[in-house]
Amino acid sequence: MPLNQKNELAQVVEESTLPIEHNGGDGWTILHGDTLQIIRAFKPQVFDALITDPPYASGGWKPAEKNRTTTQKYSSMDPKNAPPDFDGDNRDQRSWTRWMAEWLYDARKACKPGAPVCLFIDWRQYPSITDALQWAGWIWRGCVVWDKMTSRPQKGRFRQQSEYVVWGSNGPMPVSRPVGCLPGVFRYANPQNRTHVTEKPLQLIRDLVKICVPGGRILDPFCGAGTTVLAAKLEGYEAVGIEVTDAYYKLGSDRVRFALEAQPGTAE
């Protein structure tokens, strides 16, 4: 591990937890493990924003539907060609809400006062995530719409072509922050060649991270294929991600590293 990465990691985690498996480079780190455990190892008030796409656990109403693999729930691809499945998506709504509130509470303590939080979600879990956010002590401030522009048509029904970003802040959020006025609706199609089953468009995340103060440090507790970490770095931020699924820990780390090496002036 490069010395500068070790120093960066020491800035955010307690000394006794430094052996956490991790990967990264200049200004970015991905930690391998369970968010509930790792997030409690962070020092207080070290992050300027929390931006993440947690498991929705919403792919069906009945237990048999919820207990399907994430590829079966969220993709029409042949499983032989689909990205790996990911962990943590089989909770029922009540246990999911409790779990969300628990890690959000610990994450808030690791964020600076006024830090924004942005959480992706779909319509099924929208009410629950707003409860969890507030139970954890965050101030709920609104919702951003991601319009995917296309979706499967359903006769006699509205298309489900949007997902949402519930957002808030860790206490008061001064208007004097050096952040401009940001859109409330983003229109991007789903990525065509996805590394992750539920991967979000890179440009969408590049737009979202701008809610953070310039040059700040962003936390993504469910970094999957590393999209938020990559977007943060491309926009001039530092980033720390957490990923529990073995396959995505490696895929995400490799993706971020290779993408940054291909960028002029950002080679590791």
Where are these regions (language model features)?
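Conserved SAM-binding loop
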Residues: G252-S253
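Core catalytic lobe of class I
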Residues: M1-N7, Q11, E15-Y249
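Conserved hydrophobic residues forming the short capping helix/wall of the S-adenosyl-L-methionine
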Residues: L133, V256, L260
